[in-house]
Amino acid sequence: FNAPLESEGRFKITVPVLNTTQVYVDWGRSYINTVIEPGETYYFLDDVKTGQRLVMGKDARLQNELWAYPEEIGYYNVQRYYREVHHSKVAFGSLADKEVMEYLDFMKQNKQEADSLLDLRIKEHPHLSTRYVNYLRNYYTTNLGAYLMQTRFYAKDYKLPKDFMDFVTTECWARRSVPYTLYCDMNDFTNDYFEYIGEGLSGTDAIDLVLTHDQKGTITLSETERQAFQNYKGEVEQLRKAVEGCTVEEKKALVEDFNNGELVAQVNKVFIRLQSELREADLIDRAQRVTEKVKCGSVLRDFYTAHALYDYIDNMRQPLAEMTIDWLNENIKLDFARQQVLALNEKYEALSRKDFSNSTNLLSTDNLEGITEGEQILRKIIEPWKGKIILIDVWGTWCRPCKEAMKHSQELYERMKAYDMFFLYMANNSSETSWKNVINEYNVTGENVGHVNLPTDQQSAVEDFLKVNSYPSYFLIDREGHLLEVNADPRNLDQFEELVKRVGK
């Protein structure tokens, strides 16, 4: 949040907060670390000439104490630790257990030094408030947990030693402070801790997931489908026994017969029909098991689960299934968290209701049926625009950088309208609902814009031909139809325009 400075150096800013919250004022210059509370009004004075800092308000004692006696802590993240202590760089996934534990010992020492300095300060200034002392002690603990959990990205095979995690759990997580909004680092600490715990949990068996929700009545199976799922595991076990002692060719034949059988066909049809419901049910199940494992209360449980659903909608760009919304309304009691999910869900519900049937920007792919070779598929798609410079954008609705780039589509079209171009967007692994919603949301439309959402095998064939290895990927085709070996990334518009000028000569 920011506000313009008046001529006399004043500013006014309103910040929405749920609870007592740590904030940084004048970020990038003064880095003032303080606390604000909902419903309160504060007057901040920062005299850059004299160095005097003062907070006035209904209850501003803690803020003034923090400014007069700021935190004294020397925590190093892993990269800084290796740079300044070992004079070397550290790569992701490279640290052996011994090295991880050495870093833990270093951080423990830093924490002890910070606590000792605080003890000394209390002796020197015995009238410091209990709130100030508790705030700093808990800040040091939360900050320590956040730094330590970042180590998971540097540990060998991304696995932390048990003793390391035991320390984090007992000395940091078990001592976490409330409200959870109090410290900025609590968000990173919680996310990293929960995600790491979640990585150690086994996935939910898909067959069991379907049967469980069928029993609950949250999904509906026909009697034939239900029987197929109930029989599936037994049939798999029979297959396992049947292939024992068989030759490789015999095993291959038995497995192919099983996979091509009616039972597997019935099961796969259900998975396809209920893919959104099952994916969302698995997400909820995983979130619930993580929160149970870390023994957190209802507030964190609701927040973490709602956050997972919010991120899912944001990533998929499509609304949740009806059964998921019913579960959310029934089980998430934290009103703020539930309302955030429902608001985002309604946004994509509204986008999904938009009529896209007459859009000329969604290209027909009927003429591609039966074509399997990547170059041939691509040539067929771009055939109507021969003679134009064509920018190909290979993207996915699940790809955040792709969607970020699409926010600026109209700026791109306006800048390049003098160069007689066509913009072709090829979606990777994106459901039709998500695909259309993203196009609508970011207005990725225009006279010279086309979108295709090919079947997986055809999209893969085109990407193999183009040698796609990241998303988004951009490719340029000149007026003669040649695929150019150039950096065609339009996110740097100035460089891209210069490239198109050269190509168009």
Protein language model features and the residues they cover:
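Short Pro-Gly-centered beta-turn/loop motif in secreted/extracellular proteins
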Residues: 6, 12-21
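A short, solvent-exposed beta-strand micro-motif common in secreted/extracellular proteins
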Residues: 19-29
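Oxidative protein folding and maturation machinery
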Residues: 57-384
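Short, internal strand/loop/helix patches
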Residues: 276, 439-471, 477-479
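Conserved redox-active cysteine motifs that mediate thiol-disulfide chemistry
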Residues: 386, 394-411, 428-430
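Conserved helix-turn-beta segment immediately C-terminal to the redox Cys motif
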Residues: 388-389, 406-426, 497, 502-504
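Thiol-based oxidoreductase modules, predominantly thioredoxin-like and allied folds used
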Residues: 419-434, 444-458
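Thiol-/selenol-based redox modules, centered on thioredoxin-like
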Residues: 476-505
